[in-house]
Amino acid sequence: MKDSSNLLEMRNISKEFPGVKALDNVTLKVKKGSVHALMGENGAGKSTLMKCLFGIYHPNSGEIFISGQKVQFKNSKHALDNGVSMVHQELNQVRERNVMDNLWLGRYPKKGLFIDEKKMYDETEKIFKDLDINVNPRDKVSTLSVSQMQMVEIAKAVSYKSKIIVMDEPTSSLTEKEVSHLFKIINKLRKQGISIIYISHKMEEILEISDEVTIMRDGKWIATEKASDLTMDLIIKLMVGRELTDRFPKKDHIPKETILEVNNLSDAKNELKNVSFKLRKGEILGIAGLVGAKRTETLETLFGLREKGSGDIILHGKKVDNSKPFKAMQNGFALVTEERRQTGIFGKLPIDFNSIIANIDSYKTSTGLLSNGRISKDTQWVINSMKVKTPSQKTLIGSLSGGNQQKIVIGKWLLRKPEILLLDEPTRGIDVGAKFEIYQLINELAKEDKGIIMVSSEMPELLGVCDRILVMSNGMISGIVNANQTTQEEIMHLSAKYLSVTGGVNNANQIKEKV
């Protein structure tokens, strides 16, 4: 007999792929009008379970019940038509069409033979008003922020009269204010009796918004608990199967002499204003700041992705020309970008291609063809040295967990033997166990005398991994602090230092470095 309080029951779900048992007898029960968090390390089976619910995969065994009725969705459209929606981490929208087109694509309201644009507009406006979404239905999607695009996807789910909405890492690219707005919308949906399955690695958010939490590990159900009964330490223990006594590895690298000097660096748009700092060999230099501080822009200017306006980049005491990425690469710089899926990997291509793409010319033989032997050897080096979990070099990189994808992105750059490694949000979208492995890798690279500059929005990460932290505010440096002598409060204070400044430049002489 099914529990009438459960809107969704997935019972004993198993799913196998060639050589891999992705799900092993997993049960998930979600109450009506609740927020049910689904947690686990990358590769735990969360996405596979949701794809079984959404009709993308068909389980080898097990049953799915919605409102007590057994269902078996043929595909995602079948799931949508029956009240199950999914808001993907990679937002699936037609950017050059307007908002209401995206909302009603493939099911436009008709007036005779023609699309009823007035009805489409009115219906969209009504949903937006109900959810407190401040977006014009006639605006092009390409003009929206990531947060607004996400709201449109949620509105689309509501337009399908969904009873269950799956949200996959919904806050990964949102500001604190946008997260707060999202939570207000989730609470409105909850009051309407809609159930939310919320997938995230951000434990603070999980504990704030969720009613219940289900934790998975290695394709198995581990526990389902009330969120109010959980702590971050207990969640970590359940996720990884062991206690993590330290979230960060011991800093056992020793910074040496200065390797890089950046003097009065500004970009051509003058969004960066006279940024100056030094980086030592074997040092991990963090960059902190609020959204809009121009942290990513700093890395992009150093790497030649963004046009430099003025200033000098000095490596080993000599000025270098990093006006283009290929020149920066020749000068020993490497950049791991923030948006891994968009700019870091070729998701539909195999691991071997993704491992050698940054150095592809070096694999050409005298005939102009690529040396498959050398490609295989170097790919295996990346897999082994980065501890990538994969069945084959030919596995599509897009099928790997976020942590394994990021290891390959870092590994491809290490094949070029860079001296300066620029890391932009290197652990974004990566689970707690894989994060620790990335931290260990960064520490090992520092021990090999690489100079590392790391942007992160996670304050504990900067304090736990870095030697010094450069704080930015409104495109300017507001302070450089020693990581083991500062606090989150001091960094936040420095982050807000120039928020009222609309012009002018930063006086480097006013910066007090705590070293």
UniProtKB/Swiss-Prot annotation:
It is found in: Cell membrane. GO terms for cellular component: plasma membrane. It is an enzyme of class 7 (translocase). ATP binds at G40, E41, N42, G43, A44, G45, K46, S47. It is a peripheral membrane protein. Its EC number is 7.5.2.11. Keywords: ATP-binding, Cell membrane, Membrane, Nucleotide-binding, Repeat, Sugar transport, Translocase, Transport. Part of the ABC transporter complex MglABC involved in galactose/methyl galactoside import. Responsible for energy coupling to the transport system. Belongs to the ABC transporter superfamily. Galactose/methyl galactoside importer (TC 3.A.1.2.3) family. The complex is composed of one ATP-binding protein (MglA), two transmembrane proteins (MglC) and a solute-binding protein (MglB). This is Galactose/methyl galactoside import ATP-binding protein MglA.
